Design a protein with these regions (language model features):
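Divalent metal-binding acidic/histidine catalytic loops
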Residues: 1-187
Length: 187
């Protein structure tokens, strides 16, 4: 991978990820699982920009196909092209104030389950983020967004408790921004 051409998107927008119907690729599935595990750690610790791609690919760890390997190579090429990008934290004028964004990706084609995604920031730096398949099947995008809102609210409670333990009591309500008018109206 040392001599590969770098790319500037972690996942090819034209690729269609679906379950492998051609059978196992043998011992290569262990290599795939190892790569996914290492890239998941990187997405969690330092590179949230690959979290979405990693979330999708991790679903195919048990039985990957060549398309899934191609997608992992795309992520590695992306990391090579963006090697100087990472998280940096600076002094925040008001560290006890954090806010968040949430979204839901409605009903994937494989299991018809939606994905909840959120990111919370202190100042302009991400302090926590997540992307998780919802356990239920949402019938409407508004329902999927409302589930994401609920899951993000749990993260808010955890962050407020953590900040309180660190001596930073957040007196104001936590701002959580979403893009679905129906779920906002229900909240």
């Amino acid at each position: 991978m040392q001599d590969v051409n770098p790319v500037f998107t972690p996942l090819d927008t034209n690729i269609k990820l679906e379950p492998n119907s051609e059978g196992s690729v043998g011992d290569q599935s262990n290599l795939f699982a190892t790569l996914i595990g290492k890239l998941q750690y990187l997405a969690t610790a330092m590179r949230p920009d690959i979290a979405f791609a990693m979330n999708w690919l991790a679903a195919y760890t048990a039985n990957p196909s060549l398309i899934h390997y191609t997608a992992v190579k795309q992520i590695l090429r992306y990391l090579k092209g963006t090697i100087n990008i990472g998280l940096t934290y600076q002094d925040i004028p008001s560290p006890n104030i954090f806010y968040g964004y949430l979204d839901a990706v409605f009903a994937n084609a494989d299991e018809y389950k939606s994905t909840s995604e959120y990111v919370f920031l202190a100042g302009n730096a991400a302090i926590t983020w997540g992307s998780q398949k919802q356990s239920m099947i949402a019938l409407l995008s508004t329902e999927a967004e409302y589930v994401a809102l609920s899951e993000s609210s749990c993260e808010i409670m955890w962050l407020r408790h953590l900040y309180g333990e660190l001596g930073y009591i957040q007196k104001e309500p936590t701002v959580l921004l979403g893009d679905n008018n129906g779920s906002i109206a229900m909240a």
